[in-house]
Each structure stands twice: as C-alpha cells, then as structure tokens.
C-alpha cells in the first residue's frame, strides 16, 4: 500500500460494486462479479426526491426480531436535502488563498487549475441527477501536511452525479500534475524526479506530453480518455476487455493489471509492478481492496465519512516503496504488458520456491520479473541478447523520440544493475563500461538523477540474459584496435558523470531512508506509553481482510474466548507490519492485550532494508570503480602497444607497460575470481560533492609514473640527449631490459593465465561437481518423489481396497439386515394373518354364541310374553271381579243409604209421635211428669236406647277420641322437640363427626311395639263399642256413627289413633334412622342392624296376625317392612336361611372362585339385580373367566332366577288376593279408611316408588342410608310436612 495517507472510500465494496452501470464512464466491477443491466425506468433527482415521504410507515417485514437492532423509527432524509456541516465543508473544499499559494510554489493545485473548477466537463448541473454517491467521499492524502500535491482542490458536492464526476469517481482528487512533489519538501528535487515517475510508461508518452502541454485542461482530457478506453485492460484477461473506471487517472489508465494477492494462481493475470515512484500513482488509482499490504494503512472515519489515518506523521515511503523507487521496471516487462505476453504468468509459480524466506509480497513480484529472464537466458546461454536493436525498433515503431529511447534504455540498465546487486547469489559479474554504446545524451535528459552506469555480464554469467548492446570492448578482441582519444575521453566523462549522478541519487535515497528510519525511531520514542495508537489493535482474518481497530479489552475478551490462534497476524496502530500473535507473546513475555508496559513500535523491516540498500550501493560503487579502472588500463595498454610498434620504448615506458599489463592481468584475475560481489558496507550517505576522479589516481597510477594518468606520458622522448651513442646504448640497454622484463611479464602473464585457466578449470570442475551433485540431488528427489508417489499410490490403493472391502462388508451387512428385516416382516405378516384368522374364528364363535344367545333370548322373550299375557289375563280377570265387587258394594251402599233414609224417616215420625205424646202429657204435674220421664227413660234405656242417648254416646266417644289424639300429638311434639335438640347438638359438633350421643329417640322396633299395643287397645275399644251397638240393637246408627267418625278423622287417615301414631312414628324415626336399633352411634353395617331383618319380619307377621281387622294399618306396616328388607338385601344380602337360590349361587361361586379374588355375597346380590342375560354373561366371563363352567353357571343362574321370579310373582298374587278378600270382608267405612291411608302414604314417600298392589313392577326403588353420605338429602325434621303434597283430605 502506498506510504502516504491514502483516501479510502467510505462504504462497503459491494455497495460500490452494485452502483456500477453499463455506461463507458461507470467503474468496472471486480472480475468475479457479473455485469448488471440498467433499469428500464430511471428517475431524475427531482423525481426521486418528490417520491420521498416523511410519514411513510415502516414495512411490516422489518418489524421482525432480526431487524430490530438496526431499525430506526424515523426515516432519514435524503442527503441531497441535508446541508453540509462545517467539518464536511472544510474537508471537501479548499480556500482560494491556499490554492493560490500552492500554485505559486509549484506544488499542485491541479496543475494550475482553479480550485473546484470543472475539468473537461461541467460540474454545475445542479446537485445530481443520477445515482448519487451518498456515502463515500475522498480527501487529499496529505491534507494534514499542508501539501495539496494531488490537485485535491476539487469541491465535493453531495449530490454530484456519476456523469458529472466522469471516470474520476473512484480516484483521489487529481494526480500527476506538473508541479507534483515526490514526498520531499524540496522543490527542485521533486521537479527533477518528475521524469522518473513517468519514464517507464512507454505507451503513454504522447498522453503525458499532451498533459504536460496543458491539453488536460481542454479537450485533451476527453480525447485522451476516449483514445485509451480500448487499450486500458489486458485483452487476454479472463473477463475480456474492460471498461474504464476505478480510481485510475486518465493519463495512466493503460498500465495496470490487478494483482490479487491471494488469487494469483486462480486468475490468469496479475499486475506487473511499474518501475520507479510511479508505482505510488498506480496504487492510488486502484481500489483499496486490490492493493498489497492493505494493513499498512489503518485509520477511522470521521462524522462526514472522510478517512482519518493513524499514521499522519509518516511523510516518507516505507522501505518497500523505496525499493520500488530504486528498481525501475524493465522494458521487457513493459513490452509484455502491451504485447499480451503470457511468459510471466507461465513462470509465476517458480517465484514461491525461491522466495520462501521473505515475508512481503514485494519479493514475489520481483521474482516474477526475474524468472522470465532466467528462463530466457538458460534457453540460449552464452549468446548475448541483442536487446538494444529490439528496443530501438520497438520505439521507432511507436514513434518515440531519441531522448525517450535513451531514457528507457538507461532505465532498464539501471533496473538490471539494482537487480544484480539485489540478488548477488546468481553469479553476476561486471564488465567494462565501455560496452555501453557511446550515444550522446540529449541535453534535456542529462539530469544527474537519470544517468546510470549499466553493468553488463561477462560470458561466465551464463544464468543471466545480456540486456545491453553486445559491443566488444576495445583491446579484448584485437590489440590493434585504436580508439579515438577524444571520443574515449568524452565517453569516459559521460560514464563517470552518470555514475556520480547515480551515486548522488542513491545518496539522496539513502538520506531519505536514514531520515525515515530516524523519523520512525523518533516516532517510536516520542509516542507515550499510553498513546492511543498503542491501545488500538488490528488483525487479519482468515480471508486476509484487516479488522479493526479494537481496544485491548475487546481483544483480551476474544483471546480468552479462544477465537485467536497463535498464528493470527496482529499489530498495533503504531506498528509498521503484522506479526504472529505467538511471536509477540514470546517477545513481550505476556499476552499483549493484557495491561502492562507497551514496547516501542515495531519498525518492520526498516533496518533490514537499510542494510540491503547499503550492500547494494557498496557493490554498485565497487563495480563502477572496477569498471572504470579496467577501462583506464585498457586505454593505457592500447596506447603503449601502439607506441611500441612505432618506436622502441624507453625502459621507463617499458616498466610502465609491464606495470599496466600486470595491473590488467591482476584486474582480470580479480574479475574472474569474483563470483560473488562482497557486501561491503559503507556509510549510509556518500558525499554528493567531489568527483570520482579524486579517487582514481591513487588506484590507477604506478608508483614510478610521474604523470597523473596515461595522458601525462612524457612527450620529450625525441629531445636530444647528452650524446647519441650514450642514448643509443642506454636505449639498447633499456630495450634489452625492457625485452627481458617483457618476457618476464609475458612468462608471468602466461603463468597467471595458466593459473587462471587452472583455477577456472578447477572452478568449472567444482561447478560440474556441484551441478552433478545438484543433478543427483534432483534425481534423488525425483526418485524419492516417485517412491513417495508410489507409496502414496499404494496407500491410496490400499485405502481404496479397504474402502471397497468396507463397502462390501457394509453391503453384506445391509443385505443381512434387510434379509433379517424381511424375515421379521414375513413372520410379522404371518402372525398378523394368524391373528386375523384367530380373530375371525373368535368373531365367528362370538357370532354363533350371539346367535345362540339371541335364540335363547327370543325363547325367553316368548316365555316372558306368554307369562305376561297370562298375567295380563289374570289381571283382567281380577279387575273384572273387582269391578263387579265394586258395583256390588256400591249397590249395597245404595241399599244401605236407602235403608238409612228409611230409618231416619221412621225416626222422624217416631220423634213427632213422641213430641205429640209429650205435648199431650203437658197437663200432668211436673213431679209426676219427671217421674214419668225418668221411668220412661229407664224403661227406654232398659229396652232400647233413644236417639238422643245414642247421639250423646257418639259425642262422648268422639270427644274421647279427640282427647286421645291431642294427647298423642302433645307426646309427639315433645319427642320431636327432643330430637331437634339432639340434632342441633350433633350439628354443633360437626356434620362429619360420626360419634353421636345416645339419645332418647325410640328405635323402630320400640315404635312398632308401641304401635302394636295401641292397636290392640283400639281393637278392644272397637269391640266394646260393637258390643254396645249389639246390645242397643242399633246397628244402623253405629254404622252411621262409624262412617261419620272416619270422615271426621281424615287427617290421620284411620278410624282410630293407630294411623296417626304410625305417621308420627314415621316422622320421628324415618327409614333413614331405622338402622340405629339400640345405640345411635352404631353404623348401618353394625351387628345390631342385622337383627332388624328377622325381627321386622316377625313383627310384620305379628302385625298381620293381630291387625287382621284393620287392613289399612297392616297394609301400611307391610310396606315399611318391605322397604327395610330391600335395603338390607341391597347392602347386606338376602338372609341365607330363607333363600335357596342365593345359597345355590354362593355354593357355585365358591367352587368357581379359585383365585379367591371375588366377594361372593356381593357378586350374588349384584347379579340378581342385573336383568339383561347378555350382561349377566359378560360379568360372569369378566369375573370368573371365559370357561365352560362359568358359562354353565351363568346359564343355570338365569334359569333359576327366572323360576324364582315366577314363584315370587305367584306368591305376591296370592297375598294380594288374600288382602283383597279380607278387604271385601270389611264394612265400607273400613274400606274407605284403607284407601285414604294408601293415598296419604303415597304422598309422603318422596324416594318411594308408587306401586299398586295389583300391578307387578320389575324393580322397586329403595332408599339408601344418608349417614353414608355425610349429609342429609331430606328436608330438615324440624319443618313439618316439608316437601309433602297437602290435599284437601288432610284436613
């Protein structure tokens, strides 16, 4: 990433990608994304703003839980309607004064453009009509430095449309203007370096000139854009030709290809690094997601969306950028860029094998530049590449001027020089600089910063291509070559100037590196320990994206949660590069996110870069020095040889010649032995003052030489000496000596040559041995690789076999399982069929049994119908007889009434006669009259009672009866009051309390005995009355009085007090309290209750025997006893001694109840109540099991029960017949009392089933003991006649 603070786009990349349109000026998407079709309907700015509604409701879909954290209640207004804040206005606009000052100082301002002025197109179309950029604004990279060197004065409008921004929408504000500085504050230096940033754009030289000449201000901008649209992207890229866009400048649009760092192998292309500082421009023109080392640029966004870097203090490029400044790209690569060469892509995988030790992606790019050259040279070793003519023809083909051609050639040679110094292990050697063609440099390119002395490899460096012109050096191919002295001097001077200029340029680079290093160290020292940059952390996620910044607490939490591995690349905001978390923990001695002293910022590879730079410059300096030395020696050697051919040399000259030869041979030996240039370190900065000429005389002059150089050779050799002979002798001696020295020198040279050849042979042998070893190593590795592949193949086959066996076993197991499942399914199906058959058989058996039961039921029904018909016929006969009897009774009553009327008529006549007789006897005296009356009364009483006496007797009897009734009522009321008091006491103690105090309430047995005594008394009284009636012979009067008495006593429903006592006893001790025989505390199931049954039955018999003349009373008593017996049967069971059917049932059940889990008496009483034969069979089967004995028992049970019912019906009919016969034997008053008693009983019994004595009822309803319930279901006994129907007969 560029070293300067680069403006980033605000907003995610996918949003910018989706904003891409189909027009020419729209930005291209990333290569993997498809093109998007334009919408059919597009709206202008005003139309879209008119569609905005403030009161628009939130869509219902957004109200779900997942959208609630990001949901905002109020809609945001469009940005076009929101005015700029002060900070945004300050960021996006420049003041006129600062722009003018910068323009005067030559620092940009858009190359002389007015701030905010439109460039080529009008920006005054309003606040946008297209797809406006709402969020991502750019800002000049060096805003904080006060240098607006990128023409960053374009005024930003929030609603500027895509058309208004042109294809500059993703670039930073204008770059590459005339006065642009390169990171330094010094104006002249930056102006001088201007060419360096653009020299390598061989295809864009016309564009650059047009822009320099100011065409960028007018139509040139537009023309350049349209001219270069078709040639911007590589035609062989996977996505084909691309449209223009991204943040690339118009003048640099052709030169870039993307270098997706982690996707080089997937893509078929990559961006070649451009040389010199123009790489910075390239990087600025690319989106930040496709730049290398994106982690070097960290920062935040302010409220306006502008990017704020955390490294504002860094004004110098990082070492990676310095290396790029130091290494211009070679023309061959530029050519490959334009000629669509795939060589780089084909050789690109080799770079990783050679550059594993380096951490940055820089080395990978360098290797990709060097690999094609290596393969090219290996294809033709020893053959120098005639690259210069190719370049010349290429440049002529592109109509490039000579000056640009020379600049390109020098740029290439310089890059080769840097590369050979950068990679010294490749055996590069230097040759004399005279091999550089002596082309005169144009004055406009003779800047000291642009001249380099190129190294050329010797034939021994077979692994490098010879990139410079293959011109033989003087004195190497033919000794007779005579270079022109002036031309050689001129060329030598030019080369020396080039070398000095390059050294000055390197000195400037070193100064910049040193200042950057010092600045970094000063920054590291000056940052306080708790500085914000030390508290902010960034890390690279597995996708290679940089996340951050995060504070220490967040990073510590995530580290403790286990999200971070030891290999995670992290760095602080103040660090230069990322480091693995494990390395940082080792260096710091603790978890870096925990609190503690923070180490100084990590400088990255600055020291390493500085050392590398020093080694490069030292090696380059040595090479230049050796080249220069060799060139001088060759020149001197050639001149001496030429002079030797013309005239004999003096001894001094011969000595000089021998010394030159010796130096030349030594220098040749040095060069041949120097396979690796020593990395001699020197000072960081070489003085840019002084010349290389100050260094050379001491190294190149011989000690006996008086001149400073070969040009200072003595010119007075022809001067006259003292004497010619002496001079001739001296010359002969000198010639002999010189010849001897020459022979010695030749011998020495031969020895040295042989030594050199031997050494070269030895070196060649060593190289051969090394090559063989490498070949053997390679073969061994290939064999090992082959063996490993074979082993892997064997393992793979073994695994495949194992997998096949496992699959086969699994298949067999699956088949076995399927077979087992199939067998199970068949077995289950068979069992299901068998079960269905059994079910069918059972159903058939049940159907057969059902049919048999239905037949039996039909027979039973026929039998029952026959019995019912017989009973109906008997009932009809009885009804007919009864009707006849009633008719006879009515007839007899009519006769009686007629007789009574006759008697009354006779009595009236008799009374009239007596009154007449009394009136006739009024004449008698009173005494005699009374005496007569008494006598007559006595006589009458003796003879027959008179009517008045009969009436008196009747009245007296009635009065006695009423008194007796009142007395009984008083006793009854007393008993009721006592019972109520006891009940109240029991209620106070709680209704659930079982314990009851022994009260004075009479039991049912005592009440029945008392009633029986009262009935006996009443019968005796009736007998006495009947005797009196018989004595008085007034049967008719007695009958009349009995009838009158029974009518008067209708409340109690009887002629005597017996019914009233019975009714009272029912109130006192109802059927619910009859269970308490002797003690009220005893429950219903106590033993005392069991005695009630037989006693009641005996009492019933006694009552039936003793009350034969009072049928109404006895009938009522019988009903009460029957109800009690039913209760006892229901809860206690029928008396075993009385019922043979029950005894048989119990005997059979005891025999059948083998499991001893059945309560036999309860089951017998329950079965008796079940009427349906089917239910009897079901219950028998359920309780006794589905056996033949149980079925036989049920069948016999039904037969015996039917017989018993028939017998019971017959007995009841006989009893009813007897009762009816006894009823017919009584007089009409007794019959009337019986009917009245039955009616009152039916009215009083709420839970009693009303049944006529003549009709048969299947099942009679009985009362249950309410003490089992815990509460009373009847009305309170305190309230008399509650719930009973009162009739007129009751009064």
Swiss-Prot record:
PTM-bearing positions, type Omega-N-methylarginine: 107, 119, 121, 150
Domain GYF, chain residue ranges per copy: 534-582
The UniProt record lists the keyword Acetylation: yes
Phosphothreonine, modified sites: 383
Subunit details: Component of the 4EHP-GYF2 complex, at least composed of EIF4E2, GIGYF2 and ZNF598. Interacts (via the 4EHP-binding motif) with EIF4E2; the interaction is direct. Interacts with ZFP36/TTP (via P-P-P-P-G repeats); the interaction is direct. Interacts with GRB10. Interacts (via DDX6 motif) with DDX6 (via RecA-like domain 2).
GO MF annotations in UniProt: molecular adaptor activity; proline-rich region binding
Composition skew (Acidic residues), residue ranges: 290-299
In-chain residues carrying the UniProt-annotated modification N-acetylalanine: 2
Motif (DDX6 binding motif): 281-311
Role: Key component of the 4EHP-GYF2 complex, a multiprotein complex that acts as a repressor of translation initiation. In the 4EHP-GYF2 complex, acts as a factor that bridges EIF4E2 to ZFP36/TTP, linking translation repression with mRNA decay. Also recruits and bridges the association of the 4EHP complex with the decapping effector protein DDX6, which is required for the ZFP36/TTP-mediated down-regulation of AU-rich mRNA. May act cooperatively with GRB10 to regulate tyrosine kinase receptor signaling, including IGF1 and insulin receptors.
Record flagged with keyword Transport: no
Highest taxon, organism lineage: Eukaryota
Protein family membership: Belongs to the GIGYF family.
Residue ranges of the region described as Required for GRB10-binding: 548-564
Chain spans, region Disordered: 112-132, 148-196, 209-248, 267-484, 732-794, 846-937, 958-998, 1011-1053, 1090-1118, 1202-1223, 1239-1263
Gene that encodes the chain: Gigyf2
A Pfam entry, by short name: GYF
Organism ancestry: Eukaryota, Metazoa, Chordata, Craniata, Vertebrata
Positions bearing Phosphoserine: 19, 26, 30, 140, 161, 190, 237, 594, 995, 1276
Entry GO terms, CC: cytoplasm; cytoplasmic stress granule; cytosol; endoplasmic reticulum; endosome; Golgi apparatus; membrane; perikaryon
Organism: Mus musculus
Protein name: GRB10-interacting GYF protein 2
